[in-house]
Design a protein with these regions (language model features):
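Active-site proximal beta-strand in glycosyltransferases
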Residues: 1-9, 116-135, 175-176
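Short N-terminal targeting/anchoring amphipathic segment
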Residues: 91-109
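Short, well-ordered alpha-helical microsegments
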Residues: 47-49, 109-113
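N-terminal strand-loop element at the rim of the active site
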Residues: 37-74
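Short, well-ordered alpha-helix to beta-strand connector turns
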Residues: 35, 97-99, 157-159
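Donor nucleotide-sugar binding/catalytic pocket of nucleotide-sugar-dependent glycosyltransferases
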Residues: 134, 141-176
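A short, histidine- and acid-enriched strand-loop-helix "catalytic/donor-clamping" loop
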Residues: 11-15, 72-74, 128-140
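N-terminal subdomain of nucleotide-sugar transferases
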Residues: 1-52, 155-156
Length: 176
């Protein structure tokens, strides 16, 4: 099985190994015991390994690099508009090759993944929403949009969304 991770977590390659934030990689390594090939779509901006980086425990990794982006200033908005076609393409082609799509949310890349996964209704999908799932929480617009897409069973065929805590009035694909 080819497993694809769409994530905003910054990565670094050292000695033919891909490393990222250790708690996140530790969790992913649990999943990777059951996959033949791993595709990662994420930023690769790091220049040095840090004490909190850990390597993925997998031998067959394909990495599609995407740039980080934000929309905090006018200049960054213009840069982001220019980068979006490339990011959308990287996410789309990775999803096309995957048997199972795994989104890491909330985050900018996770939002793009949540939107693109709609065109792959027959693929098995999971999303880990590692933020506050409380619908009453004061959150950025992009986080609320991600939660809406992920909870919408019309848009998320074959997807299970893993969230922290149990919340009232949730759709059947939301799993605490």
């Amino acid at each position: 099985m080819t497993f694809c991770i769409i994530s905003h977590v910054d990565h670094i390659q050292i000695n033919n190994q891909w490393l990222a934030y250790a708690p996140y990689v530790r969790e992913m390594n649990l999943w990777l015991k059951y996959v033949d090939q791993l595709i990662i779509v994420a930023p690769n901006q790091k220049t040095e390994q840090t004490a909190i980086d850990l390597a993925y425990d997998h031998k067959d990794i394909i990495f599609y690099q995407v740039p980080t982006f934000d929309i905090k200033t006018f200049r960054s908005k213009i840069k982001t508009i220019g980068r979006l076609p490339f990011i959308f393409w990287q996410v789309f082609r990775a999803m096309q090759q995957a048997d199972h799509i795994h989104l890491r949310c909330p985050g900018d890349i996770g939002l793009i993944g949540a939107l693109i996964q709609v065109v792959f209704p027959k693929k098995k999908k999971t999303a880990k929403y590692a933020g506050n799932w409380d619908s009453k929480a004061n959150q950025p617009w992009s986080y609320r949009l991600q939660k809406w897409v992920l909870a919408n069973t019309f848009l998320t065929h074959n997807m299970q969304v893993l969230v922290y805590g149990e919340w009232p009035n949730q759709t059947k694909n939301i799993k605490p």
